[in-house]
């Protein structure tokens, strides 16, 4: 990461896409996509997804590292080319607890990530806890971030410190996605970004962390990109020029969250304007969902009724029976809920792929389709871009490859934006 940031600050057009997903097919796609390049791949876990108690994936940071490395070994991607990051490390998961208890858990969270070899650490203590004011004072946020940084430094080996990098600050939306429709977004003001940096510098120095400050490579801001269930707010470069000019006076770059669904031109403009770390998550699993839905439609036409996976029906049944991951985000009417469950850009389905019933139905569908020849006309109907690549000899009509290539479509846009 340090080399990439140095190259960007030296004037090169270079950025990096941060893959924020724990889905094995998404991670496989991210690694396979860059297998034959010289680029490193940045894969990040969030604090609610992976933590010392297992998170919603059931994985600790060490478990997640081994999970990613096993996929890398399978696809032939060198482990040393993987950068592991921890996103929103702080009280995010424990906001319902008092601040002291939440921060104790947050300290252990950061230690677990660093011990597991994660080298990009987002110190985010911006969330109010049960006994806090809303919003927190910037000074309190910075003081807590310094406590978390101290925790990281206390367990990092000398070798780890050479690679260790910190990201500070936070964007406006809550981690995990918008809960309601958006019409506009508040772009971070220069004075707020400057205040974030100033308060963190002061808090770090007060705790004897002056050297650790040199490891702060990025600040999270809102450049004016966001999405909800059916709306996308696109990057307007002219609106972010004050931010772009301010960061040039520092040794840092920006990290932009929720960059999913922007155009490839927007990614290039974002990197040009020093938003050099572009985070993506739901767009990748949305592409995965599109591929699985397309294959499910193909299965319905090619496979005898008694042998079908009923994949789409199973997904719907499970999500209606167990609505905890989407209920507070999606619309309330039954038909509206079904549309959001299937097609929302927020892609809450991503929380359900590990469910045993859904996992088994997808596996059945894949086995069914691997045993038949899929007519080209059907691929053209349901996966038109993949049809074109099959026609040009770049791709085979194999279900797994079709899913991979569908995810590659998202990664291709980021590569266009980030490539030197």
From Swiss-Prot:
Keywords linked to the UniProt accession: Galactitol metabolism
Record-linked InterPro entries: Aldolase_TIM, GatZ/KbaZ-like, GatZ_KbaZ_carbometab, TagBP_ald_GatZ
Matches recorded under SUPFAM superfamilies: Aldolase
Pathway note: Carbohydrate metabolism; D-tagatose 6-phosphate degradation; D-glyceraldehyde 3-phosphate and glycerone phosphate from D-tagatose 6-phosphate: step 2/2
Biological processes, Gene Ontology terms: D-tagatose 6-phosphate catabolic process; galactitol metabolic process; phosphoenolpyruvate-dependent sugar phosphotransferase system
Protein task: Component of the tagatose-1,6-bisphosphate aldolase GatYZ that is required for full activity and stability of the Y subunit. Could have a chaperone-like function for the proper and stable folding of GatY. When expressed alone, GatZ does not show any aldolase activity. Is involved in the catabolism of galactitol.
NCBIfam families documented for this protein: agaZ_gatZ, PRK15052.1
Name of the featured protein: D-tagatose-1,6-bisphosphate aldolase subunit GatZ
């Amino acid at each position: 990461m340090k080399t990439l940031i140095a190259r960007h600050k030296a004037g090169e057009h270079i950025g990096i896409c941060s893959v924020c997903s724990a889905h094995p097919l998404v991670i496989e796609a991210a690694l396979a996509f860059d297998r034959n390049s010289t680029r490193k791949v940045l894969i990040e876990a969030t604090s609610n997804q992976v933590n010392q108690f297992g998170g919603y994936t059931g994985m600790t940071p060490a478990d997640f590292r081994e999970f990613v490395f096993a996929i890398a070994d399978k696809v032939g991607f060198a482990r040393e080319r993987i950068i592991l990051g921890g996103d929103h490390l702080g009280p995010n998961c424990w906001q319902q607890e008092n601040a002291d208890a939440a921060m104790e858990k947050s300290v252990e969270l950061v230690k677990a990530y660093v011990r597991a070899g994660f080298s990009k650490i987002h110190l985010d203590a911006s969330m109010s806890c049960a006994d806090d004011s809303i919003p927190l004072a910037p000074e309190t946020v910075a003081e807590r971030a310094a406590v978390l940084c101290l925790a990281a430094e206390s367990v990092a080996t000398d070798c780890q410190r050479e690679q260790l990098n910190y990201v500070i600050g936070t964007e406006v939306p809550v981690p995990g996605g918008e809960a309601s429709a958006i019409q506009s977004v508040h772009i971070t003001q220069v004075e707020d970004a400057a205040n974030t940096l100033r308060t963190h510098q002061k808090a770090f120095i007060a705790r004897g962390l002056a050297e650790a400050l040199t490891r702060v490579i990025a600040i999270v801001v809102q450049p004016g990109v966001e999405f909800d269930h059916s709306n996308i707010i696109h990057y307007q470069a002219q609106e972010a020029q004050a931010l772009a000019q301010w960061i040039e006076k520092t040794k840092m770059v920006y990290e932009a969250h929720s960059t999913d669904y922007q155009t490839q031109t927007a990614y290039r403009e974002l990197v040009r304007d020093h938003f050099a770390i572009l985070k993506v998550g739901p767009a990748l699993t949305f592409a995965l969902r599109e591929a699985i839905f397309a294959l499910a439609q193909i299965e319905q036409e090619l496979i005898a009724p008694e042998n079908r996976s009923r994949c789409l029906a199973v997904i719907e049944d499970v999500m209606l029976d167990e609505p905890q991951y989407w209920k507070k985000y999606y619309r309330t009417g039954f038909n509206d809920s079904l549309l959001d469950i299937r097609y929302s850009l927020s892609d809450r389905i991503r929380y359900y792929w590990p469910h045993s019933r859904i996992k088994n139905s997808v596996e059945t569908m894949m086995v069914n389709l691997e045993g038949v020849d899929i007519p080209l006309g059907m691929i053209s109907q349901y996966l038109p871009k993949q049809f074109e690549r099959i026609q040009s000899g770049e791709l085979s009509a194999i279900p797994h490859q079709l899913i991979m290539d569908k995810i590659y479509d998202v990664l291709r846009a980021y590569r266009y934006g980030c490539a030197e």
